[in-house]
C-alpha cells in the first residue's frame, strides 16, 4: 500500500465493508502506511468504535487531517450497477460505498503525506491524523472522545482539514470554512384521550399545540450574518393518535431541529421555545439534544494555504461556504483550532451507485500536498 497510487489505495479501503461503527481493518492498513513514514500510531477504542490518533513530530504547530473510515449502509445491493463493496472503475469514475464519503479523501491525504514527507523529511511542526469509525453513526465514541483525550494531556491541534466531500460541481470549487450549529427538540404535548363523539370529556393535544407550533414555524430567530444564513426551524416528525378514526389522541409527539448561526446560542433558542410553549399554556415535556455549536474559520494561515493550493491546482479560486449539515469539525473547532473542510464532489454521497471521478482524487491529493507544503515546509 505504501507505494500505491491514490486510486489503488482508495480501492483497498472501499473493498473493506466498514458499515458504521465497523472499521473493518481500514485503520490498521492506514497505521501500516503511516508507520512506515515515521508516524506514531495510537488506537483508541471506545465501546464499539475504533479511533486512530497518528502523529509525526513532537513540536507545534500541529496540522491534523480528520476523517472517518465508517460508511453508511449500502441499501439493496442488487440496486447497484456494481457491487458496493467492490471498488470498480467505470468510465473514469471509481464506484463503491465510501468512494466520495470519505475513503477517497483518506487515500488522497495518505498520498499527499507520503509525497510531502519524502520531499521534506525535516518539515516543521507535526502532521497528525484523527480518524474514527463513528462519524456516520451516533458520534458518541468517535472524534469527540479522542478530542477529550488529547485535551486531557494538553495536545493541541492548530490547523485541521476535515476530508468531508465539500465540493459541488468539481473538486475544490467549494471549501467549507464553517458549519451551522444543530439543536434538536423532542416535544410531547399531553392531552386526555377520549371518544371523538365526546370531545368535552377529552383534551385534544393536537388542537392545543397548533397555535404554538404555528408560532414556532413563523418565528424569526435571527438575521444571519456575512458567513451564515438566518437560523432555520424545521419540524421533522409529528405523530399523534392510535390509528383509529374515532379516538382523540392522548399525546402529540413533535420532533424539530434548529440549524443556527453564530448570532444565537443553543441556550437562547431553548429559552425562546420554552417561552412560546408556556405562553400557550401547554402541558408538555421536552428533551433537547445538542449536536454542536456553529464554528467559523474566516481568516488565518490554514485558509490562506488552502485557497492558494486549490488555485495552484485548478487555476481558479475556490468559494467559501458554511452551507450544509454538521461534521466532526464541530468537535475540533472549540479547542481553538482553525478548521476547514475540503474533499471530493458530494453529488452521490449516501446514494446508490456512489462514485468519485478518479482524476478528482489525483487533484485532491495535489491540493492536500500544496496545503502541507505551504504550512509546514522548511
Curated annotation (Swiss-Prot):
Which keywords has UniProt assigned to this entry?
Answer: Amino-acid biosynthesis, Cobalt, Diaminopimelate biosynthesis, Hydrolase, Lysine biosynthesis, Metal-binding, Zinc
Which Pfam family, just one, is annotated for this protein? M20_dimer
Question: Where do the catalytic residues lie?
Answer: 70, 135
Known InterPro entries for this protein? Bact_exopeptidase_dim_dom (IPR036264), DapE_proteobac (IPR005941), Peptidase_M20 (IPR002933), Peptidase_M20_dimer (IPR011650), Peptidase_M20A (IPR050072)
A GO molecular function assigned to this protein is:
succinyl-diaminopimelate desuccinylase activity
Binding of Zn(2+) 2 occurs at: 101, 136, 350
Summarize subunit and interaction data from the UniProt record for this chain.
Answer: Homodimer.
Q: Which family does the UniProt entry place this protein in? A: Belongs to the peptidase M20A family. DapE subfamily.
Main role?
A: Catalyzes the hydrolysis of N-succinyl-L,L-diaminopimelic acid (SDAP), forming succinate and LL-2,6-diaminopimelate (DAP), an intermediate involved in the bacterial biosynthesis of lysine and meso-diaminopimelic acid, an essential component of bacterial cell walls.
Protein name, as recorded: Succinyl-diaminopimelate desuccinylase 2
Q: Which organism is it from?
A: Alteromonas mediterranea (strain DSM 17117 / CIP 110805 / LMG 28347 / Deep ecotype)
Tell me the name of the encoding gene. dapE2
Amino acid at each position: 500500500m505504501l507505494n500505491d497510487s491514490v486510486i489503488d489505495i482508495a480501492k483497498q479501503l472501499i473493498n473493506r465493508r466498514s458499515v458504521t461503527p465497523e472499521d473493518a481493518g481500514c485503520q490498521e492498513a492506514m497505521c501500516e502506511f503511516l508507520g512506515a513514514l515515521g508516524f506514531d500510531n495510537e488506537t483508541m477504542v471506545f465501546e464499539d468504535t475504533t479511533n486512530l490518533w497518528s502523529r509525526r513530530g513532537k513540536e507545534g504547530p500541529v496540522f491534523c487531517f480528520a476523517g472517518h473510515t465508517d460508511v453508511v449502509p449500502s441499501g439493496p445491493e442488487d440496486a447497484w450497477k456494481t457491487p458496493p463493496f467492490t471498488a470498480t472503475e467505470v468510465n473514469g469514475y471509481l464506484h463503491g460505498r465510501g468512494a466520495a464519503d470519505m475513503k477517497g479523501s483518506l487515500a488522497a491525504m495518505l498520498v499527499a503525506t507520503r509525497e510531502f514527507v519524502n520531499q521534506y523529511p525535516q518539515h516543521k511542526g507535526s502532521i497528525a491524523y484523527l480518524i474514527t469509525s463513528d462519524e456516520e453513526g451516533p458520534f458518541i465514541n468517535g472524534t469527540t472522545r479522542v478530542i477529550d483525550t488529547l485535551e486531557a494531556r494538553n495536545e493541541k491541534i492548530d490547523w485541521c482539514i476535515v476530508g468531508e466531500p465539500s465540493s459541488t460541481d468539481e473538486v475544490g470549487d467549494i471549501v467549507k470554512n464553517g458549519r451551522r450549529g444543530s439543536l434538536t427538540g423532542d416535544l410531547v404535548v399531553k392531552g386526555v384521550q377520549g371518544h371523538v363523539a365526546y370531545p368535552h370529556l377529552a383534551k385534544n393535544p393536537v388542537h392545543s399545540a397548533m397555535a404554538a407550533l404555528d408560532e414556532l414555524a413563523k418565528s424569526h430567530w435571527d438575521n444571519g450574518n456575512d458567513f451564515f444564513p438566518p437560523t432555520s426551524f424545521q419540524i421533522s416528525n409529528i405523530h399523534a393518535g392510535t390509528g383509529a378514526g374515532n379516538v382523540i389522541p392522548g399525546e402529540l409527539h413533535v420532533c424539530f431541529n434548529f440549524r443556527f448561526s453564530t448570532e444565537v446560542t443553543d441556550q437562547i433558542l431553548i429559552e425562546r421555545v420554552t417561552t412560546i410553549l408556556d405562553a400557550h399554556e401547554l402541558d408538555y415535556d421536552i428533551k433537547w439534544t445538542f449536536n454542536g455549536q456553529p464554528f467559523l474559520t474566516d481568516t488565518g494561515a490554514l485558509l490562506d494555504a488552502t485557497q492558494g493550493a486549490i488555485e495552484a491546482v485548478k487555476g481558479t479560486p475556490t468559494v467559501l461556504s458554511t452551507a450544509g449539515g454538521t461534521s466532526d469539525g464541530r468537535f475540533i473547532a472549540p479547542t481553538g483550532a482553525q478548521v476547514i473542510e475540503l474533499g471530493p464532489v458530494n453529488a452521490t454521497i449516501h446514494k446508490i451507485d456512489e462514485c468519485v471521478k478518479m482524476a478528482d482524487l489525483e487533484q485532491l491529493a495535489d491540493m492536500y500536498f500544496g496545503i502541507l507544503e505551504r504550512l509546514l515546509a522548511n
